[in-house]
Amino acid sequence: MMEPSEDSFETMMERKNPSSKQMESSEGSSNTTVETPPGGRVEAAGLASGLAQEMGEQSIDLRQDMEEPSSGPHREIKDPPNDLLQDLEESCEGSHLEEGGPFGGAPGEMEEEEDNPWESQEDQDYYTDLAESEEDESPEEPDSSTVEVMGMVRSIISLYFRMQDLREQQRVAEEILMNAINKGQLPNPKQFSGDRREYHEFIVLCQLILQSYPRVFCNDRLRVGYIISHLSGMAMEWAGDLLERESSVIDDFPAFLEAMNDTFEYRQALRVAEDAMFNLRQGDRAAIEYINEFQSLVPTLGWPDEVLQAHLCQGLKEDIRQYLFRIPQPNSLENLITLVLQIEDKLAERRAILRLLPESRPRHLTWLDSPVPERWTVSTWLPNEFHPGIKRNHLFLLLLVRVNPYHSVAVQALVDSGATSNYMDEGFAQEHYVELYQKPYAESVQTADGSLVGNEPVWLYTEPLVCLHQNHQESLEFDIVASSKFSVVLGIKWLQLHAPEIDWVKGRCTFHSPYCLKNCFRPPPPCIALEHHAVSLLPGLPHQYSDLADVFNPKEADEETSDQPSSDGSDDLSESEPSELQQAGDSDQSEETFYDCASTAPWEPVGAGTQEKAKQEEFWDPKDMLTSRHDYVQMIPELFDQLHGATWFTKLELRGTIVEESMSIHQTEDVWKVAFGLELQDMASYQPFLICADPIIPQGVIHFILKDMIGLFVVSYGQDVLVYSMSQEEHYHHVRQVLVRFRYHYVYCSLQRSQFHRHTAEFLGFVVTPKGVKLNKSIVSTITGYPTPGSRKSLRNLMEFAFPYRHFVERFADITEPLVRQLQADLPFYWGDEEQEAFVGLKRAFRKAPLLYHPKPQNQFYLQTGVTKTSLHASLIQMDKRTGKKVCCAFYSRNISPMEVEASPAEMKILPIRAAFMVWCRYLENTEEPIMILLNKEDLASLNNDRLTVLLPGHWVFFFTHFNFDVMEMPSSEDDQPLPRRQRLGERAQQRRVATTTRPTMLVTMPAPTGDQSPESEDEEESEGALHPDEPNGQNLQQGYLALIPVDQIFNSFLAHFSMAQIRAVLLHFYRSLLFWKNLLAMAALLVMLRFRRRLALLPAPAADPARPPQRRSLRLFLDASLLTSSGIATAVTQLFTQMPPLVGTNALPAEELAELFLGPGPWQLNALRGLQMTPRFWQMLCQFFGIRGRALEGTQTHPSPHQSLAPHVEGDEYVVLREALQDDLQRFRQCGLHDGLQDTSQDAQDDVWALRPRQHLPTEAEVLARLTYIRSTQGGSVVIHRELTARDLIDFLASVYTQALPTLVEASPPREGATLEELPSDADEDAGLD
């Protein structure tokens, strides 16, 4: 195999080349395409589908513009009888059951379900059923309010980008009008062939001509016919198709324009999304943030799935790409995203594990450090880089070349204007098995610089290969050159054919030509997936393993002599088999004789079962549970470390009988160690066994066969072999490896009892899920159905069975202490109320045993500990990122020894913390984030409220220095309230600064809220929740999205072009969905009113008759034929442009100044995401400014501050009575429902309240009124605004808004009086003047 070229990379791990027969059978399929009409391509303006649809289709007339996987058969799997069931029968009047193995937790042979006479109705509804667990793993649906907010934000963004397109048309229209003014007439439109670069000029000119002759083009059909008469080429073919189909758009001019826009317009939203995609990189962000931003661009772009996968891989971090390309290629973008997130978690876990000693590191992460040759290089080049050796125009494109009908390869394609043809490197073609053809005669290479592709003659060429760039696809033939520095070179012929628009500076290439619109913008032919067309030879066997059917059919294997490994993807695996056979072979006997010789009887030590049972009874001593004070490293959850990140499981059940011959396995926990590869058996060879349909195989032989897989992606014990993987594609490869190994060693599996491609699996009494592990239903049913023990032997059997599963039960030692005390031989057996209560509590604890989540060392840990008179207990807790709630990772408990009872009270409180550090040192030692120890108020006060080391004994101080920990108070409601995170104020401020600097500059890339959130986003939400505990995080998130809306740009971009009625309609539509944020609504309304467009004359001193504003003139332009022919058109147009106001805001008060005015220089930044809290004092000042009287408003309420001053009451236009004026004002405020927070306090008490106000300077009423009266102009001066006219508009607007408030948006609190706004009665002539 040749080394890959330096500038090429595969989007994923390269799939094996199919056999020649498969290639021949599928020949010609690559040319199969699905014909679709040009108008049916992917919508370019996906973002413009929100608000535009609600407001109706907008005409672009300039006159109006100014206005689950397959698996085998499934059946319930029941565990075989065990010793516990046998002992139960002995205690129940001699009832008999079959005797099983000594380990009840290990699933053995599949037998039919037997009725359990002790099983209760609760046990039948046990929550650990597999079907129920799969439902629990389904993602939560997002909140309806969040979905509504995001939909509204997307609608606003759509409208914003649509207005950019209209502004471009307006710019073109202005240029055409100015040229027409100079020449005296409008030019005739040129023939439009379909080039998108000429579309705006063509369609605008046509509309101007149609508007100039309204009598000639009096109906829609004539207008459409005029435009069609000026079409040619591809555009004429598109219009001809509409005429042939008799489409309804022919008689509807606005619909025809919209259809034409969809086909020929290169919209601003698509342009911005493409620029964002090419510049998108993960950088130092979390993968979830990068993926969210990436996914927000996908609907707008509409690129093929494989192109999106290549761009997603290109922007990832180098360390993620390094391990991503070791895994087989995912078949979809969704699977790739899932795999990227899993690899990021694996890498974070690896960084945490590397802080441990080498001997303490788990084996399952060794694959991350295994040397694997690089297959591709993405980080060495970027699309906008240039080659230093090329002195002419050139650029690089991310091009996907479908080297065969089965998969594509992403390469760095050089677009060179000096190359005459399209070239491909010979080494690249050989590496990817590209089919080559010989030319009848050699051709010379003609390039401006022969050093790039060489000067040797060209003899070979390729068949047409599908090439993809963005949503542009074509079939290209390449000439093969021997010494090219680049994998693919696109020359001048390619440039002339497509005529792309090239930005040589940015390295961008976009396609607008009619040829591309007709032939290239269509969905590419899909890759041929051989597994989708395969037919399984056995019913129930997935078709991916149809060639390995002999592993499940021993009779077919006996008839055939095929011992060859699979030929479709497992050749590399089979090459390692002879070396294993050589290691397994005997020195005095050849390989063939050793393996082909059949044994007449299985090899098994005599009396192994008796010795094993004797060792088991000797090993477990109940006295140690009461007196031992040693805290050993806990097996669970360390046992399941290798399952972290596994989401796909396949359980294979071996045929025959598997016997255990080891003398060192005494307990159930010893079985777990062997099954999960924690204790690998050192075997150099094994004795042959009888090759038949149901053989008897020693357990050590199975482990020897799978010795290089156990602990990495396989666990095995008895007849069960569990294969697990991170991704679906990797899982196929792993299962195939195991089946090929079994076929080579003549080990057969039962197809009926095997389960393929599941998300949960049962193994050794456990239910394994992607999240964690929980107890099997049969284990729980056995314990909960156990009858009341009548003898010490019966109680001992129960405790021996339940003891290995103590890690799944909280406070196991505390619950079972009375039962263990009865097992002591020096005391008579007694069963009283205390023992019965402990027995019932043990059943209850197993029935409620939770799912133990996989601990993640990269995340923060929480310790919850406790101690009683007889035992201590601890719980290892983490936070679930998806739900935000606490999850348990492990439990530990033991009895307190007699020596520890004499310890001091302080040492007794620290004792469970020390024990937890001992048993979970693998996870808690050298953590990056501090371990938070949850204590109640009493313990927190006694432990100095800061550090435990103050009260530690001398011999414990050195031990505790190995751990980074801190203490905090235990939350009151442990089930509902999430655990708090302890952060410093400086860290929160730093996070806010980072969030402000890293805010996306484009709203089109804002991510939608998902169930999975990045750690950074969670930290920010939690810190905000700590600052504002009374507000939910969801509302802060929604307001955060609204805060990112560029109100200034929206107003200055398109609101300035509308009339007053249109502005009112747009604003009402926009704010109707934002009513439940009344504070934000008030500020937005104020901003709109302050940005009044007209400059009015300064009013004189207060007089009875105020100045009347001049009538607003219409800015519409009507071009009639008579006007065009006259000589006064220039004068008319000049006057029109002179009277037109500027297109930018003139009287604009910055939002920062306004927020600083009412909130002070600092708090407005802090409250940016909370929403502005407008107090009654603010509303009363507005009433005073606009001359409005306040009265009660139904359905609303105010929240007075304890230090709030009395709001002023407006008596007239200029006279204000403040708080210090008269005592009768206080009574009047009570009647009106406006409270000032002082109530009936005395004047001295009120003065004290004024003294308690913040020391920072707050604006006085006079400053506020002066600031509102004069607003800033463009020239830097101050312009007075017309109070009466502005007040009238504000009153109408607020009244219409508040009357449409929904009852459900009102806060759920007892109704009481609020405040409303009411217009003072005025004279009829004043009203008429204001109208």
From Swiss-Prot:
Keywords: Developmental protein, Membrane, Transmembrane, Transmembrane helix. The chain crosses the membrane at residues 1070-1090, 1117-1137. CDD domains: retropepsin_like, RT_LTR. It is a multi-pass membrane protein. SUPFAM superfamilies: DNA/RNA polymerases. InterPro entries: DNA/RNA_pol_sf, DUF4939, Peptidase_aspartic_dom_sf, Rev_trsase/Diguanyl_cyclase, RT_RNaseH_2, RTL1-rel. Residues 109-123, 128-143, 569-578, 1015-1024, 1320-1331 have a biased composition (Acidic residues). Residues 1-123, 128-147, 556-595, 971-1033, 1309-1331 are annotated as: Disordered. One of its GO terms (cellular component) is membrane. It is found in: Membrane. Residues 19-30, 992-1001 have a biased composition (Low complexity). Pfam families: DUF4939 (PF16297), RT_RNaseH_2 (PF17919). PANTHER family: LDOC1 RELATED, RETROTRANSPOSON-LIKE PROTEIN 1. Plays an essential role in capillaries endothelial cells for the maintenance of feto-maternal interface and for development of the placenta. This is Retrotransposon-like protein 1.
